[in-house]
């Protein structure tokens, strides 16, 4: 996919590794619909290289940052008239958290006005290199964006004060314990918010993250901007508002998990097609996304404490204006916290507030965190973000198999309690995912785990 990329003047220009001209025996993993984008791996041979064609409207210096994984490797970035070098191993940035992916500053190169060829090569790949992307931005714009990101960042102290939260993948795929699954709108109508809030309150959780859409895109409230894209994906009942009220009465905040719905890509006229997603022309998709976020944010105001945006690898390759996305995400509540899940990669933007931390291992990863429990990464791939993790307690994110009970926790209780206490003391905020039946109830064994952590911390 050897296309010319136009330099952005107002943000970093993203050069994805998977669209580079590859010279060597690289391995590239492509998704079926080009929604989720992945890294290039098996960079093991001297002389292997990746090249991009860039059209610049100006002549001047640009900072180059690599989202890269390496072990004692040396890379060279060349435009033919300047070279930036950096040993990823010497900076020891490959050991951050539980992954050695990081954002590595490669230095400054000079671009001429017009077409440039930028090549990243390695004279010593060391233990092997993997590359997700390069980012090119002028030094002045870089400083301006860093300042704006700090100004937009929300206070996350309430998350640390909450100590921990719960996550629930309650979606169109959720199944009852027994019997036939209800259609989504009926399940929304019948959800018992008072019983649910009482259960959450007993666990001691200070907030919940409710998954509004996962594999399938639905939303449990009457949202016009969603209906405008595709009718039949919302509900008459505003379950989100009802949950805000019931949880607020218990001193519990509500956050929402959001998935853009790319799993619908196989449907010829389905949700994904109608969103306007197009990797080479993302304006319609981003406009639709911003409209949805703005409407939801203004509808719930301060009642909506945060967003958890899954699949950052869908957003980032579109090279969006993350400041614009952040403004939409915080519509109605400038203090709302947001994150873009980077999976194994480093942070995709500074225009966010907390690190996703998908997986139990992040509960035990304290690198780059100060010992005072303040919980903000001082360096590394998630620098300046609030430490957070979300993980599965039982078997799955969502209870989507009919006629079976929720399985018991996969983690021994003693180990779970100790890991939770250690993480919370370090300032990490855990969101524990509990499987949930369609009627809004959970496993007694799992909720007992959570009541135990409440008792332990009291």
Question: What role is predicted for each listed range?
Answer:
Residues 2-458:
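Mature catalytic domains of secreted/periplasmic carbohydrate-active enzymes
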């Amino acid at each position: 996919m050897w296309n010319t990329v136009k330099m952005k003047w107002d943000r970093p220009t993203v050069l994805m590794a998977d669209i580079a001209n590859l010279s060597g025996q690289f391995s590239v993993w492509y998704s079926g619909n080009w929604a989720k984008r992945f890294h290039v791996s098996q960079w093991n041979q001297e002389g292997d290289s990746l090249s991009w064609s860039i059209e610049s409207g100006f002549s001047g210096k640009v900072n180059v940052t690599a989202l890269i994984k390496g072990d004692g490797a040396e890379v060279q970035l060349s435009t033919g008239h300047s070279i930036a070098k950096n040993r990823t191993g010497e900076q020891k940035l490959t050991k951050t958290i539980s992954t050695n992916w990081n954002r590595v500053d490669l230095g400054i190169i000079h671009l001429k006005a017009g077409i440039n060829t930028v090549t990243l090569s390695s004279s010593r790949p060391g233990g092997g290199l993997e590359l997700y992307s390069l980012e090119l931005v002028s030094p002045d714009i870089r400083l301006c964006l860093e300042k704006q990101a700090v100004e937009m960042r929300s206070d996350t102290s309430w998350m640390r004060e909450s100590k921990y939260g719960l996550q629930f993948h309650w979606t169109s795929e959720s199944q009852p314990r027994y019997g036939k699954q209800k259609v989504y709108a009926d399940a929304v109508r019948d959800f018992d918010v008072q019983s649910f809030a009482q259960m959450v309150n007993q666990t001691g959780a200070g907030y919940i993250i409710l998954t509004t859409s996962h594999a399938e895109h639905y939303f449990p409230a009457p949202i016009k901007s969603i209906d405008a894209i595709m009718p039949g994906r919302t509900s008459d009942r505003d379950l989100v508002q009802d949950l805000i009220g019931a949880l607020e009465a218990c001193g519990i905040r509500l956050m929402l998990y959001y998935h853009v719905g790319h799993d619908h890509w196989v449907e010829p006229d389905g949700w994904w097609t109608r969103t306007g997603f197009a990797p080479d022309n993302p304006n319609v998709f981003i406009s639709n996304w911003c409209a949805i976020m703005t409407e939801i944010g203004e509808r719930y105001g301060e009642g909506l404490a945060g967003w958890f945006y899954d699949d950052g690898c869908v957003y980032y390759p579109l090279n969006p204006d993350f400041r614009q996305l952040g403004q939409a995400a915080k519509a109605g509540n400038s203090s709302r916290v947001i994150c873009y899940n980077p999976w194994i990669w480093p942070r995709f933007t500074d225009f966010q507030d907390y690190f996703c931390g998908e997986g139990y291992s992040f509960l035990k990863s304290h690198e780059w965190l100060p010992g005072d429990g303040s919980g903000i990464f001082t360096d590394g791939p998630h620098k300046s973000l609030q430490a957070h993790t979300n993980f599965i307690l039982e078997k799955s994110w969502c209870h989507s198999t009919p006629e079976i009970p929720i399985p018991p926790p996969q983690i021994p209780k003693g180990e779970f309690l100790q890991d939770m206490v250690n993480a919370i003391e370090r300032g990490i905020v855990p969101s524990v995912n509990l499987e949930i039946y369609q009627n809004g109830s959970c496993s007694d064994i799992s909720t007992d785990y959570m009541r135990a952590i409440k008792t332990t911390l009291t």
